[in-house]
């Protein structure tokens, strides 16, 4: 039967976000008013999905911080008022970065409740999420190796040029001042 977006998140997470131990960390940022309903649904469904996909879920919740709320606007883009008081709405996806900063993870996949798909359409999503994660982890590993080399203070001019090429070609970071290093 039809599944809720929360259930689709659990299914998708099992397909590409399980660690070597089979643990899938899933974090939901929800409104305070709906948090208990989400928790109840997780209690009802997580075991079923864990069994189906052979994983263990670590599911956490946070609430979008009110400090990231924005003023609601009417059709004329004027501040919307409810009985004379300005109405504030959740600030949107960008505001969730503050919640993500509170998580301790090397890789975080962000998925909106509006763009989950049923299993028959997940193949491309799973393939590309795995690909993106692989590229990210490879780049991260190389960056950390270069940082260790820089911290050691023991590197050659050739290694410095290699690091510069990595920054420019792999991370797309260019700084006009690096021209002096290239000469």
Question: Model-derived features: where do they sit?
Answer:
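Domain-scale recognition of functional cores that engage charged ligands
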Residues: 1-183
